[in-house]
């Protein structure tokens, strides 16, 4: 059985609705009774209750109430609920939600018991949240958030979280705090975490100024870490900037780095200066850089470096300089400290239209000075390349040349290499070639070519070899000859001749050979001619052999 009632809105009161339901179930013993009630007031209240009797050892019931109201700009919503099941669970909950302007708060409290303790609340859990967000007319924004959770049965889950955030045109700050454990709500609790970050921007039209900080604190783990970054940059009257990074761990500097840069360049001048400093438990670095480039003809750069802790290096200087004036070029590279010169390189160069000359010197901490020179000429009738290299105990000179004359027509090519070892005894390789026109007219043409080779190496060829050939054309007497001369080691001379001609209408060929070797196989002096004197097949062979006697 049941009933319901609807009361319309009147007299400033909202519409109200009520209903009740009762159900009985008879099975031979005590009847099982279920009762339910519902009350609803539009816009403000909603209530519900239900009970069950004669089914369990005791009466089971559940109730719920939801209320809403608003007064003086404050809106409130409340929720209450109870649940009881004999021998199983007993629960009571109370919730509250409030909003006033930019502030929102809510809370929830639950008391419960299980099994045999269902009638009496044995445990309790509660949670609450708070949120506030404000926006000012100046563009500032603020946010605050708080959260709490506490359980008597599981204390390790109890915690408190707080978040603050502030932001305006040139400033931003955020902080997060978390407290947990059995003493979560006490200021002396060591089981908490704090994280914060800050950013500032104080820049202007010709200024950039930034600051950033990050903090992490965990007292239980003995962790206190702080990171700070600062940057400043100026753009007028010249460019200058500096940046610094600092990392602290438990109050001690863990890592510190800083850099500065200045650019005072103008239209035709480049001038830079920079400094870098770094300090950590493992390594210390201090570096400075300077660049000076006033115009195209002068350049100078210097780097100074100091290392400490893991590697030790004190006042290392790296200097690079270049200078030019007319056809002259000069460059220097130096790497040194006050006690040691690690590297020194210098070079002087002359560059003209057909001339290149360069002189260089290299010295390091691992070897004494090494000098070198390169000379090159390039013209229509002469080309020369000379390379010279001198070390502490050895010296090398390499020369390649090409010469050409139009009158008398003569061409020379040569390659010379001279090596001086530790003993001071020079050893050289010479290779020369020459082609020369000795005579050229209407009746006589003569041309000579020569090749000379000298070397000190142990090879299956003579250490001195001269090969010379002379070609003669006598147009008046219709006589052509080729003479080949070979001289080995400056003493052993071999001469071979070949003559082709025509006399009185009779063509002839003559050949001769003269050598200084054993004449048992080939006579030392041999000559032979082949002559034709008719138009048929008749031939005459004239030969003469010389072996000391003609």
Swiss-Prot record:
Q: Which residues form a coiled coil?
A: none
Question: What InterPro entries does this protein's entry cite?
Answer: LOC400499-like (IPR048484)
The organism's superkingdom is given as Eukaryota
Task: Please give the name of this protein.
Answer: Putative uncharacterized protein LOC400499
């Amino acid at each position: 059985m049941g009933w319901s009632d609807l009361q319309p809105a009147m007299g400033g009161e909202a519409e109200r609705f009520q209903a009740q339901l009762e159900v009985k179930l008879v099975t031979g013993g005590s009847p099982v009774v279920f009762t339910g009630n519902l009350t609803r007031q539009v816009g403000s209240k909603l209530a519900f209750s239900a009970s069950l009797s004669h089914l369990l050892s005791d009466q089971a019931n559940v109730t719920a109430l939801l209320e809403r109201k608003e007064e003086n700009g404050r809106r409130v919503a409340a929720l209450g609920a109870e649940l009881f099941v004999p021998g199983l669970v007993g629960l009571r909950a109370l919730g509250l939600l409030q909003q006033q302007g930019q502030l929102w708060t809510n809370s929830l409290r639950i008391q419960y018991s299980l099994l045999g303790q269902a009638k009496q609340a044995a445990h309790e859990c509660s949670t609450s949240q708070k949120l506030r967000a404000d926006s000012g007319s100046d563009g500032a924004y603020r946010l605050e958030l708080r959260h709490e959770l506490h359980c008597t049965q599981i204390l390790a889950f109890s915690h408190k979280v707080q978040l603050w955030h502030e932001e305006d045109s040139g400033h931003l700050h955020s902080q997060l705090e978390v407290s947990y454990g059995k003493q979560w709500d006490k200021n002396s609790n060591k089981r908490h975490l704090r994280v914060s970050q800050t950013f500032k921007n104080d820049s202007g039209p010709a200024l950039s100024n930034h600051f950033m900080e990050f903090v992490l604190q965990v007292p239980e783990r003995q962790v206190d870490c702080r990171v700070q970054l600062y940057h400043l940059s100026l753009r007028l009257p010249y460019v200058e900037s500096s940046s610094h990074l600092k990392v602290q761990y438990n109050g001690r500097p863990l890592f510190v780095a800083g850099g500065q840069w200045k650019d005072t360049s103008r239209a035709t001048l480049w001038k830079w200066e920079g400094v870098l400093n770094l300090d950590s438990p493992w390594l210390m670095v201090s570096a400075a850089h300077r660049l000076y480039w006033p115009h195209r003809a002068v350049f100078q750069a210097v780097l100074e470096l100091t290392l400490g802790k893991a590697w030790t290096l004190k006042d290392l200087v790296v200097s690079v300089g270049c200078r030019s004036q007319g056809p002259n070029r000069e460059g220097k590279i130096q790497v040194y400290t006050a006690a040691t010169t690690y590297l020194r390189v210098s070079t002087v160069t002359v560059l003209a239209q057909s001339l290149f000359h360069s002189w260089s010197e290299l010295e390091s901490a691992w070897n004494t000075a090494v000098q070198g020179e390169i000379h090159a000429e390039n013209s229509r009738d002469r080309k020369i390349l000379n390379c010279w290299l001198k070390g502490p105990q050895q010296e090398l000179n390499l020369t390649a040349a090409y010469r050409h004359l139009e009158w008398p027509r003569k061409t020379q090519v040569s390659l010379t290499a001279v090596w001086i070892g530790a003993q001071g005894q020079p050893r050289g390789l010479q290779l020369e070639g020459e082609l020369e026109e000795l005579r050229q007219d209407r009746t006589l043409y003569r041309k000579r070519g020569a090749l000379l080779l000298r070397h000190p190496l142990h090879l299956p060829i003579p250490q001195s070899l001269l090969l010379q050939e002379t070609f003669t054309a006598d147009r008046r007497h219709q006589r052509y000859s080729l003479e080949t001369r070979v001289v080995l080691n400056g003493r052993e001379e071999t001469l071979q001749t070949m003559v082709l001609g025509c006399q009185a209408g009779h063509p002839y060929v003559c050949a001769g050979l003269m050598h200084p070797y054993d004449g048992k196989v080939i006579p030392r002096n041999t000559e032979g001619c082949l002559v034709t004197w008719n138009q048929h097949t008749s031939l005459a062979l004239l030969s003469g052999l010389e072996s000391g006697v003609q």
